[in-house]
Amino acid sequence: MTAAFYDLMDFDEVLEKYDPVMGLEVHVELGTETKMFSASSAHFGAEPNSNVDPVSLGLPGALPVVNAKGVEWAIKIGLALNCSIAESSRFARKNYFYPDQPKNYQISQYDEPIAYDGYLDVVLEDGTEWRVEIERAHMEEDTGKLTHLGGTSGRIHGATASLVDCNRAGIPLIEVVTKPIEGAGARAPEIAKAYVSALRDLVKALGVSDGRLDQGSMRVDANLSLRPIGQEEFGTRTETKNINSLKSVEQAITFEMQRQAQVLDDGGVIDQETRHYQEADGSTSKGRPKETAEDYRYFNDPDLPPVIAPREWVEEIRATLPELPWVRRARIQEEWKLSDAEMRDLINANALDLIIETVEAGTTPDEARAWWVSYISQKANESGVELDALGVAPAHVARVVALVSEGKLTNKLARQAIDGVIAGEGDVDAVVAARGLEVVRDDGAIEKAVDEALAANPDIVEKYRAGNTKVTGAIVGAVMKATRGKADPAQVNQLIAKKLA
C-alpha cells in the first residue's frame, strides 16, 4: 500500500495534538576478516553461499568460537559512545524461526550487554546540539539474506520463490539501541537523521565498519509511538525495519507520525507491529505483529563462556581511539577558518570527510569544497543516493583539480570527466582519454576558430573597437562551440584581444 492510500494528518496538526517518542536501533556490521563465531570470510560481495561453514549453517555438532577482534571493536564503539563497559557480559540465544536463520536462533546478547548507558551528541541543521542517550550496544551475529522472486515489491508477500544466501549469516554485528527519545516534537525526524549520520561517521572514523547504508552494513530500525500532549505513558509503538538511507530515516519517521496521528484521531488503535519502508514514496506498509522479549525465549548460550573485559584491556583499547569526528570538525573549522554557517553546510551535505580526504590528496580546502558541495552534491541528489555512494572518490576530485590547474581541462570538461567517473567509465584519466576531453593546444586550430567567429560577428568587432571591451563573450562562446568546449578560454581571450588591437 502506498502513501496515496493512507489518510495522513497534516504534520503541524500532529504536533498540536501528539508528542512523538522515538527509539532507534542501528545494526552495524563490523569489518572483521572473519565471522563472529567461525573462520569463514566476512567479505561483502562473494558468490552466494560461498562464505559458509558448519557454524554459520547451523549444522549439528558445530561449536562457535568468539572472534576476539569483534569483541575489541565492540568495546571501541562502546567507549566512543561514552558507554560503561561491562567487565563480564554474556551471549544469549534469541529463538525464532525464519528461512535466513539457519540455526533457528540468533546468537545475541540480552540482559548482559558489553556496553551500556552512553550518549552521542548530534548537531542539527541550525547548529544546535541534541544529546541522544544510549541504552546499550551489544554484540550479535547477522542473519542470512533472502531474495524474493515473482512479486512486485521485492518482499515475501506475493513472491513465488525465495532464495537464501547464507554468506551474511554469522557476520559480526553491533546493535546500538537508544533510550526513548522524548520531547523532540517537530524535530523528531531531523534528530533521527542526524543521529544515524553521526553514528555512521563515528564507526567509519573508528575503522570498524564502512557504514554503508546502501549496502546493508548499517541498517536502521525506527521505533515510533505517539501520546497525547501532556500524557506521561507511552503509546503503542511500531518498528519500521531495515531503513537504508539518511533521507529514508527522516521520511519514515515523518510518515509514521502522520499515519499514527490520523489513526488515533479516527478512533482507531495502533497495532504493535513491524512495518516496511517504501522507497518509492516514503511510506511504510504493514509487516508482522511485533514480538516481545518473552516471545524470543532468551537464554544464555551454553556453548559460549562469558566475555571478560579486564579494566586494563579496556584502557588499552581506549588509548587506541582515533581523533573522533566532533574533535576533528572543531580542528578543521579552526584550521580552515570556516564560519559556523559554512561548517554546518559541509556537515549537512555529509561532505566533510570527503572534502578532508580530497585536501589530503592534494587540493586546497576551497577547491575541494567547490566540487563536493556544488556539482557532485547536485549529481547525488539527481541520482537519489548518498554522496559517498555516488562512485566519486576524493582521488578523482583531486585529479580533475590538478588537470584544471595544469590547463589540460577546463571546468566544463572537468565536469564531463566527473560524469564519466559516475557512469563507471573508469578513473579520471581513462575518462579524459576515452572521451577526448583534453583541452585543445593546437594554436592554429584555435586561431582559425577565432578568425571565423570574428568574421561572423562584425557588429561585435565594431563595438569592441569603439571601446566596449565587454562584448567578446559571444565570440568566446562561438569559439568554444567550434572546439566542442576544448579550447582554453584564457587563450581564446588573448587571441581575440590580439586580433582586435
From Swiss-Prot:
Disulfide-bonded cysteines: none
GO BP, sorted A to Z: glutaminyl-tRNAGln biosynthesis via transamidation; translation
Pfam family, one: GatB_N
InterPro entries: Asn/Gln-tRNA_amidoTrfase_suB/E (IPR017959), Asn/Gln-tRNA_Trfase_suB/E_cat (IPR006075), Asn/Gln_amidotransferase (IPR018027), Asn/Gln_tRNA_amidoTrase-B-like (IPR003789), GatB (IPR004413), GatB_Yqey_C_2 (IPR023168), Gln-tRNA_amidoTrfase_suB_CS (IPR017958), Gln_synth/guanido_kin_cat_dom (IPR014746)
Reactions performed catalytically: L-glutamyl-tRNA(Gln) + L-glutamine + ATP + H2O = L-glutaminyl-tRNA(Gln) + L-glutamate + ADP + phosphate + H(+); L-aspartyl-tRNA(Asn) + L-glutamine + ATP + H2O = L-asparaginyl-tRNA(Asn) + L-glutamate + ADP + phosphate + 2 H(+)
Stretch list, region Disordered: 276-299
Subunit composition and interactions: Heterotrimer of A, B and C subunits.
Protein name per its UniProtKB record: Aspartyl/glutamyl-tRNA(Asn/Gln) amidotransferase subunit B
Protein's organism: Corynebacterium glutamicum (strain R)
